[in-house]
């Protein structure tokens, strides 16, 4: 694969023992890395924003330095990863209203700058 790691199904219960609904459907906050070195797109995004999810699995990247966004659902998981010319998210930006548009605008600007 392009990024090393695993993917696992969300457990039935979170770290606090509360039952998790799987699939995870709904809005959750993403905490973006504030390190400029993490990825150039992040400069255009607020430190935190809410995005829409529909998923039953979460990524477990081997290299934690690739994690640029984190969400909490039964515990923290990688919401976004980036490495060189790769930027991937676990949520649906196209369904995430204003936050999704900000992300897609930042992505388009970043891609245009790579020419």
Where do the model's predicted regions map?
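Acyltransferase
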Residues: 89-115
